[in-house]
Amino acid sequence: MDHSIVLKSYGKINLGLDVLRRREDGYHEVRMIMQTVGLYDVLTMKKRKDDKIEMTCNLSFLPTDERNLVYKAVKLIKDKYHIKDGVEINLSKRIPVAAGMAGGSSNCAAALKGMNQLFDLGLSIDELCEIGVTLGADVPYCIWGGTALSEGIGEKLSRVDAMPDCYILIAKPGISVSTAFVYKNLDLPALSKHPDIDGMLECLKEKDLTGICNRLENVLETVTIKEYPIIEKVKKHLCLLYTSPSP
């Protein structure tokens, strides 16, 4: 019972994110290219002698009960496969919260993989993804990792050419943005320009890092920048740093 497993839960960025339409069920149909980055949380899991799920986290403001996707994932697997043992979980967060980096979905994906490993369930990646999509649209991608084209509500995944190795600077202002708020306030008919997803795919194929950088675009910024002008300020500052001559 003392055996524990340690899993890295990687964050992601969107190289390009387009929203095509709002579906009748309230979800939005998207077309986006996602990329795993080197920043990760750490999930430690081990069996308990009782049947309880106990979760701890280094961030006191995050819930550690049924409201947390990790807890939900563990409970779902326990119930689905009639697992009697309990599970002890520790989550050490490094990925910024509410930053659009799929931290929660990545943690959920790691928990599903952890349960598969901890209890020798023998589930395939496809089977884990089928379970994961019931917990969140980004979870299947986080199970995959790497570079992928995501379509539908995020559950239709296609492996695409990997992004060239490079350093990525991630800036997170002191704000938290609700994904639900952003999608609710997205005015699709008013969008005059959409990200060049096909062009991005071609640049990935050609390993054209400059072309990739020139096509970085996210339609959700039409909402977030209006609501949080600091985002535009940070972007402009980073551009000035990039174009400033060396001393």
Predicted regions and their residues:
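Generic structural signal for hydrophobic residues
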Residues: 70-73, 111, 234
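ATP-binding N-lobe of GHMP and related small-molecule kinases
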Residues: 1-99, 117, 121-126, 163, ...
